[in-house]
Swiss-Prot record:
GO CC annotations on file: membrane
Origin: domain of life: Eukaryota
The entry's keywords: Membrane, Transmembrane, Transmembrane helix
Pfam family, one: UPF0767
Localisation per UniProt entry: Membrane
Organism this protein belongs to: Ailuropoda melanoleuca
Family of the protein in this entry: Belongs to the SMIM12 family.
Membrane topology reported for the UniProt record: Single-pass membrane protein
Protein name: Small integral membrane protein 12
Transmembrane segments: 15-34
Amino acid sequence: MWPVLWTVVRTYAPYVTFPVAFVVGAVGYHLEWFIRGKDPQPVEEEKSISERREDRKLDELLGKDHTQVVSLKDKLEFAPKAVLNRNRPEKN
C-alpha cells in the first residue's frame, strides 16, 4: 500500500504542491498582517548627500549677481609667474 501511495504522490507532486504552498502562504500572510496590525505612517526620506549639495549650490547661485563678472584683462595669467621664471634671475 505504501509503495503505491508514494508512487501516486511522486507522480502528482507538482499538482498537489502548488495549491498547498499557496494556501500556506496566504494563511501566513494574513496571520502576519493580523499580528502586526496597521501599517505605520511612512517616514519621510532624508535627502541624499548629492541632493543636499545641489540644493546648497542652487541657493548660492540665487544670491549672486551674474551680470557682474571680472573682465578677461583683469584675470591672472594662465600659469603663475613662479613656474615660468623659476630658473631666471629676477629683472629689476
